[in-house]
Amino acid sequence: MSLAHTTVLLWAWGSLQAFEIVEKESVFQRTPCPAFLVFDNAAYLADMSFELPCHCKPEDVSAVVWYYQKHLGSKRTTVLTDFDGRLLTEAAHVRVGSSMLVRFSIRMFSLLVFRAQPEDTGLYFCGTREGDYFYAYDVDIQSNKEIVASFKDMAQEPLPDEYYGALHVFTTFWEWTPCDRCGVRGEQWRFGLCYLQYPDLSPRYIKTRSAVVSCGSGAVPWKLHLQTKYHTPELQFQSCLVSCQKRNKTRKGVLAIYSYVSKLGSRPWVPQVPIQFHQQRLGHGLIISCPGARPEHAVAWDKDNQPLYRAQYLKGVNRSMRVFIDHGNHLHIRFTQLSDRGIYYCWLQGLKIAGFRLGVITRGRYPASLSDPETRTAIELTLMGYLLITIFFITIHLCRCCCQSRCCPNFSAQTLL
């Protein structure tokens, strides 16, 4: 290719890049801000992370400030920014239950909230440090504590729609997740959130459909909350089977080294995924998390070669379960037993990514801590036992006093003493 052709191609490539940059910078110019501030309704499940883009802003504004209000017209407004519009927070460093002030991040004018909680429900405003608002969201974070699970393979149906006159309460499902395993039978699921349809909703809230908003939206009148509080979020599961993609095998040189070290020419056991070792004291609880997994991901667990399907191990399927998977994809083992020893494998989005080798010891010091759920349970049961004994003791003495006052109405206080 000649020098002239090369020059023309480079010039064309540079022009395309310049055009791309101009297009990205002109997004806010092509999106006019509403003359009357309205709220864009959005609903999420608890423990999920979500992003709120600032869809419009004046051209001369170089940094945005995000504000939060619990209710419209509230006198308390929380500022979610460092006033430079560039606050960054890593999702991996966010702990469950921490304050929203340490669970948000601002990237390219968008607000990111990690591990959202029902307390984060409210109104979010995109504006300037002077308090001028450009765009607003009505965010509804629905709790996952009373979530209802159904399994299509067992012919279980989701919750039926509810009608209260002009009010229509129903569930809107998200897309199915990918199959959580490959090469063997797996499971996929989707979650549904509570929505309602009502003709007399506030016009300041943008609806997904005509007169339809999430059940926790600020557009819902207070008198309707009693009808919607029992329509909880849902989880629906079904079986799936997909083939595994080809993955890079262990290099021959590494296998040759293993063969040399074994001395007998037989290769030692080579784990397919990284394995973490942990020893747990007998009788104490343990919670295992899948690395890099979030509640909306497809996560599966195996013990050695035995799959732990949610149809048998999902939290709430059986109240007496000692080993179960919660709605955040964590594996719980309560009151560890010797039979729990083994390797627990974690699948993420259909790929086996990690293993957890669990050993159970019967001796050794184990410092008690209030952060340990088993310790808290033991303390609660002990206090409850003392409370019941105290109530029983007081009840017996009250009965004795009542009986003596009826049988011997002329007894004196000295007689009782």
Curated annotation (Swiss-Prot):
Residues making up the signal peptide according to the UniProt record: 1-18
Organism per entry: Mus musculus (Mouse)
Kindly give the PROSITE patterns that the UniProt entry links to this protein.
IG_LIKE (PS50835)
Which stretches of this protein does UniProt put in the Extracellular compartment?
Answer: 19-377
Which keywords has UniProt assigned to this entry? Disulfide bond, Glycoprotein, Immunoglobulin domain, Membrane, Signal, Transmembrane, Transmembrane helix
Name of this protein: Ig-like V-type domain-containing protein FAM187A
Entry keyword annotation includes Thylakoid:
no
Record's family?
Belongs to the FAM187 family.
**Gene name of this polypeptide:** Fam187a
Which sequence ranges are marked TM in the entry? 378-398
Q: What is the protein's membrane topology class?
A: Single-pass type I membrane protein
Q: Which stretches are Cytoplasmic in the membrane topology?
A: 399-417
* Subcellular locations according to the entry: Membrane
Q: Using the chain's own numbering, where are the disulfide bonds?
A: C290-C346
Q: Which residues are glycosylated?
A: N248, N318
Question: Is Electron transport set as a keyword in this record?
Answer: no
Q: Which residues form the Ig-like V-type domain?
A: 268-362
